[in-house]
Structures are given as structure tokens and as C-alpha cells.
Design a protein with these regions (language model features):
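Beta1/beta-strand and adjacent pyrophosphate-binding region of the FAD-binding site
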Residues: 2-15, 32
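Core beta-strand elements of the Rossmann-like FAD/NAD(P) dinucleotide-binding domain
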Residues: 3-5, 186-196
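Active-site substrate-recognition segment that forms the wall
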Residues: 21-25, 48-52, 65, 73-84, ...
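Glycine-rich FAD pyrophosphate-binding loop
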Residues: 24-44
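Dinucleotide-binding Rossmann-like beta1-alpha1 core, especially the glycine-rich loop
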Residues: 48-123, 247-249, 285-287
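Flavin (FAD/FMN) cofactor-binding and adjacent substrate-gating region
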Residues: 72-73, 90-160, 165-166, 172-181, ...
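C-terminal catalytic lobe of FAD-dependent flavoproteins
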Residues: 287-380
Length: 380
């Protein structure tokens, strides 16, 4: 590991590697990523892997729209398929809400369409639509693999001179008390000084922030996903489909299906055990929605973390009062689908002091103390 870098990034997940690549593309090649384990060893390796433009706030939509072309350029490399995303309304109130939401999204240039129950049944005849009132569907949304995207970002960054140091856990920060500037990072592999440091450590970002002396309200929350064995090939064409009422959702995954659902997990607990009792509950929803697939059991399960903030939106930008310290974390389950935009925006900020692609001031850390929390983060 070198002793100094212009920019040190903490975390080699999909966000950290994207920032590094975009920095190098912008001409800043003196970048080091510090990773406590190995590239993509954390949340980026566990995600369901959907990407969508169907959000409740315009700024989230814009992050997805900026990211999508970047992902499409790497489509084959990251196993990207535009199967779409579909939200199913299971009662009249939800159907009214989905229609209103789709109208807003269309005004933000999201190519979302509203489908009747009959249209859903015709397009995807393996779905049980007996309780469906209608759906919102965007064909440009779809599926990918965040681990492959992380590897692709990392490879491109390294080709432009970025150094990625694995097994380098951050243990302390050095701050100059005279001007309150971050001067260096102490790691399990030694010390590295830097002009700028970016915390992009996913669910561990809050803990890393504490080492730097800041209150960064990012906490891990367990999310689980369950995989079936081989199922009928027709389901491979399915969009990532969400039951609006329960949050149950599924996507094609290899020769089977991947199911997930919120379980009201506590914040801050680093528990990665798989709850098979919860898996059985999820399986019940899967059997109801996909009766033709004759799904009898779960083959495997996995657990990872969302990196949650109080308003389920990220913290992006400089940290006031600590010169040279920046954050790009707290994506609350949306890191992969906003990774490209985050790389662009943070590269702009780090090289020029401002962003030109999109105003990121709504994501400032100061919003929590000022009571300026953002709207519904549309977390699945």
C-alpha cells in the first residue's frame, strides 16, 4: 500500500468502485480503495439485483436514469436483462395509488405503463392474478448481478491506475486539530495520508464515521432472499414482480426463482443468519403468486444488509466541519441501481468542489439535524 493518495475511498463495494472508476476517468488517478475484506465481500454480493426507475421521488428517478446507460454499456458483463419491474395492486386503494404514482413518474420521463388484470394475465400466464386489481410495469427496468457490476467497476478503475488494498480494515483517523482536517487513515495494514477521504463502507459506514468523530446515521438491517430449485422456463421472462400490499417480490434467477420480502428487521443488529421459519412464510406467498411452477421448497437462502438511514435515502457529499471528509453511503437497498450516478456525482464533487449533473444538496448529512428528511424511499 502506498503511503499517500489524493483520494482514499473506504469500501470496495459497488459504490466505492464506481466512485474510483469515475474519478480515474475524470483524470484523478491517484486513488486508493481500502477494503476490510475483499472486493465485493459485503452487501454488494448479496443483493437481489434489480434496477428500476419506478420511485416515489424525482431525485431517485434521476439517479436511476443517470445510472441505466452505464449499466447497459456493461450488459453482457454484468448479466443484465431488461425484463422489467411490475407492481401489483391487490386492492382498490392500492390501484388508485399506483395509477397516481405512475402519472407522476411519466412526467419524470419514466416509460411506465398501467396494465389491467387481464393484460397482466395475458402477458405472464404463469402468474395468479385472481386478487390483482391492476399493475404498473416499466419494461426498461430489469435484473442484473451487483457482484458482477462491482467487479466490472473495479477492473475498469484498476486499469486506470486505481489501487485496491484488500484486508485493510480502517481502525482510526488522524485529524489536524488546528484546522479540523482529515490527514490520514490508519488501517490494519498501516497508515495512508490523503487529501480527501470518502466513506463508502455500506452498512459499516456508521461505525467508520464514529472512528472519524462524526454521527453518521447509517445502520445495517438484515434482508433475506430465498432461491428455489429449477422451475418452468416460462418464468424466466417474468419481470421483478412486487405485491404492493405485502412487499413480497420475486425475480427469475438462473434456473429457478429468487424470493424476498421485508420482515421488519431491527436496525443495527449484524445478524446474517437465515431465518428458515420466515423463509417458509415467504414460500407461501410464492406458491400463491406462482401456482403453475409447483414450487414445493426453498433450495437455498441468504442474508445480507441494507444500509439504512432515517429517511431511506443516501448521505452524499462533504461533511461540514471536517475538511477533506466525504460520504457516499446509506442507500437503503438502492446502491446498485444508483451506483453509476453516484460515481459520476462524487467524481464531480471531489475534482471540482461541486456537482453539475445533479444537485445533491438534498442528500446532505445536515438534513437530519435540520428536519429536512426526504420523502418515501420506496424500499422493498
Amino acid at each position: 500500500m502506498k503511503s499517500h493518495a489524493e483520494v482514499v475511498i473506504i469500501g470496495a463495494g459497488v459504490i466505492g468502485t464506481s466512485i474510483a472508476w469515475h474519478l480515474a476517468k475524470a483524470g484523478c488517478h491517484d486513488v486508493v480503495i481500502l477494503e476490510r475484506s475483499h472486493i465485493c465481500s459485503g452487501s454488494s454480493s448479496k443483493g437481489v439485483g434489480g434496477f428500476r426507475q419506478q420511485f416515489n421521488t424525482e431525485i431517485d428517478v434521476r439517479l436511476s436514469q443517470i445510472t441505466l446507460p452505464i449499466l447497459l454499456e456493461m450488459a453482457e458483463e454484468i448479466d443484465l436483462h431488461q425484463n422489467g419491474y411490475m407492481y401489483l395492486a391487490l386492492n382498490e386503494q392500492e390501484w388508485q395509488q399506483i395509477q397516481a404514482r405512475a402519472k407522476r413518474q411519466q412526467a419524470w420521463n419514466v416509460p411506465v405503463e398501467l396494465l389491467s388484470t387481464d393484460e397482466v394475465a395475458y402477458r405472464w400466464d404463469f402468474l395468479n392474478t385472481s386478487d390483482v386489481y391492476g399493475a404498473a410495469y416499466c419494461a426498461k427496468d430489469g435484473l442484473s448481478r451487483p457482484a458482477l457490476a462491482t467487479a466490472a467497476f473495479a477492473k475498469r478503475a484498476q486499469a486506470l491506475g486505481v489501487e485496491i488494498v484488500e484486508n485493510a480494515e480502517v481502525i482510526a483517523f488522524e485529524r489536524n486539530v488546528s484546522d479540523d482536517r482529515i490527514e490520514a487513515v490508519q488501517t490494519s495494514q498501516g497508515r495512508i495520508s490523503a487529501n480527501k477521504v470518502v466513506i463508502a463502507a455500506g452498512p459499516q459506514s456508521g461505525a467508520v464515521g464514529s472512528l472519524a468523530g462524526i454521527d453518521l446515521p447509517v445502520k445495517p438491517m438484515r434482508r433475506q432472499a430465498f432461491h428455489t430449485g429449477p422451475s418452468q422456463a416460462a418464468a424466466s421472462t417474468a419481470p421483478l414482480t412486487i405485491d404492493e400490499t405485502t412487499g413480497f417480490h420475486f425475480r427469475p434467477d438462473g434456473d429457478g426463482q429468487l424470493f424476498a420480502m421485508s420482515n421488519n428487521e431491527p436496525l443495527g443488529e449484524e445478524n446474517l443468519t437465515v431465518d428458515l421459519e420466515f423463509g417458509a412464510r415467504v414460500l407461501g406467498f410464492a406458491k400463491h403468486r406462482l401456482p403453475q411452477l409447483s414450487i414445493e421448497k426453498i433450495a437455498t437462502g441468504r442474508a445480507g444488509f441494507y444500509e439504512m438511514t432515517p429517511d431511506a435515502h443516501p448521505v452524499l457529499g462533504a461533511i461540514p466541519g471536517v475538511e477533506g471528509l466525504y460520504c457516499a453511503c446509506g442507500f437503503s437497498g438502492h446502491g446498485f441501481m444508483h451506483s453509476g450516478a453516484t460515481g459520476i456525482l462524487m467524481a464531480e464533487l471531489l475534482t471540482s468542489g461541486t456537482t453539475s449533473t445533479l444537485d445533491i444538496s438534498p442528500f446532505a448529512i445536515t438534513r437530519f439535524a435540520e428536519g429536512k428528511l426526504l420523502g418515501d424511499g420506496a424500499v422493498l
